[in-house]
Amino acid sequence: MEAARKGIITPELEIVAKKERMTTEELLPLVASGKVAICANKNHKCIDPEGVGSMLRTKINVNLGVSRDCKDYDVEMQKVMEAVNMGAHAIMDLSSHGNTIPFRRKLTSECPAMIGTVPVYDSVIHYQRDLDTLTAKDFIDVV
């Protein structure tokens, strides 16, 4: 958004414009005004940038993650890659058990789709406490 407000056409904006069958001149003001977000986190090593918002195609999201009942990170990564191969644009990691950090690192290094998480779940895992005992500061510290 910052670059768009300065009139700078980034490589990510060019990619999204092409995917959306728009010109960069059409997309730039949508990003600058906040009507479109380009999801391209610098820590996500292999992301294929996507645009989300007004005037753009609907994106496909897949929810998955490890839990007490399904603890196998390799199985979850297989699901991730199958979802991407089937056209998913976004993966929502709903992991609610164990050490999620290695799984997230694997996601951001191997999965080209946008990735989302649930900070509330991360807080419960990090502090190993019940949700009703966590404070606003606990949530912010985890994020």
Q: Where are the model-predicted features located?
A:
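Alpha/beta enzyme core
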Residues: 2-143
